[in-house]
Structure formats: structure tokens, C-alpha cells
Amino acid sequence: MPLAIDVAIAKTNKYASRDSGDTAEVVERPGGGLSVVVVDGQGSGVAAKTLSMMLSSKAVSLLKEGVRDGAVARAVHDSLFAFRHGKVSASFDIVSVDLRTKTVVATRNAQTPMIVWQDGDVESLPTTSGPIGLYHFTRPAVTQLPAQAGLRIVLYTDGIATAGDRAGDSGFAVGAFVVGVKSEGLTAEELADRILVEAVRRDRNRPADDLTVVVLTLGEHAEEPLVRRQSVRMPLP
């Protein structure tokens, strides 16, 4: 049966900050499929938001032009390094469902692991690359998986991973949390919400950093006609 792609993004700001340094965007690929871009700018507040929006805009523009994900990551890094002279960093993720190659590709310059859930198993894949912007020859880490029904991928920024640290708790083991809820049959949106709610709870309802969770799932469908749906909810201060 054909596949259906579900993407859910849940995010919130650092406590008492009106602007989030995290930016997440979804873009349709010219060859078919979707890409999700997540940028976590250094720091928080207006400066971090300006940085993350600038980098995500550049990435989205290149993806729409058909540039390959790895080249996009390098170009965004080169731009940041050239203009900020290695003094400003950002975490940068692209996760794509590429219909040309029938694969899911994660291209990452990040500090947090990626959670992969397939065939009933949940695995936490540590990143092998650091953030962009600091060193001239920084390269992304690339993970490629077959695009098949039942695959679920969870990405999150470092605010999720460190949730609870300032309250004296250990870091948030997202992989273990996913294992604990995997029998509940959660949708992408429900899983993203559950992870975000748990991170906020661990921070005593006062997030110590910007928090972003992205969940991408692949499932089978028998829809006719094919209807694409997209919705966004943004509560205003």
C-alpha cells in the first residue's frame, strides 16, 4: 500500500522569553516528499531567533531549488562561519522523506541523539557531528533509512535533553520515554505533545531553554482522492 507522511512539531519558549531561538519549518521537495528543517540558534531571545530564522530561510530556499541535503547543511554552515567568524554556533537538522530514492534521510549538525522507532524497536542514535558555525571544516552526520510503513523518527533540541537539570534531576532520556509510551498507539502529534509536556514538567513548568520536538511517521493509507492536510496552532502572548 502507498505511504502517508505525518509530521508534528511542538515547541515552546524559554520561560519569560517572548522569542524562541528555535525555528522549525516544513518544505515540499521538488522531486517529491517533504523536508523538515530545525535550527537552534545560540542563546535565546531576539538575537537567537533572528539567527535561527536567517539560517532556516537559507536552508529552505536551497531545498526548494533541489540542492541535496548534505550540500544545504554545508552551505548554511559556510555562510554562518564566514559572517560570524566562528564566534556564533547553531544546531542544524534536516530530516527528509525523499521520494526519488524512497529513503528517509537525516542530515544533522546537532548535540542531541535522534530516536528511531521501527519494527517494534526504539533506538537512540547519537550524533557524530557538532553544531555549525564554529570550525571551518564542519560536516554533517547523515543517516539514511528505507522509507517504509511503521518508521517513526523523533528529533529534539538541547532544551528537551537538559529538561530538569536545573531542578537537580538527571537529563531527559527521550528514548526511554518513547519506549514507555510505544504501546499506546500515539499519532505523531500526540507523541510530540507528550514529549514536550514531559520536558516542561521536568522544568517545573518554567522551561530553562527553548524546547522543540519534531516527530515524523510513515504509515500506510488507502485514501481516494488524495488529500493533503496541514494545520498550525500558535497561541499568542
Labelled PLM ranges:
Residues 44-65, 152-203, 222, 228-231, ...:
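Active-site-proximal, acidic helix/loop segment immediately C-terminal to a metal-coordinating Asp/Glu
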Residues 123-125, 143-145, 226-237:
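Generic detection of short hydrophobic beta-strand segments and adjacent strand-loop junctions
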Residues 122-123, 129-130, 134, 174-177, ...:
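Small-residue (GG/TT-enriched) beta-loop-alpha framework at ligand/catalytic clefts
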Residues 49-119, 126, 138-140, 192-216:
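Catalytic core of PPM/PP2C metal-dependent serine/threonine phosphatase domains
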Residues 40-41, 111, 156-160, 210:
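DG-centered beta-turn motif at the end of beta-strands
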Residues 22-79, 167-171:
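Primarily the active-site beta-strand->alpha-helix module of PP2C/PPM metal-dependent phosphatases
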Residues 1-20:
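Regulatory cytosolic signal-relay segments
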Residues 17-34, 90-92, 125-170:
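Acidic loop->beta-strand submotif enriched in PP2C/PPM serine/threonine phosphatases
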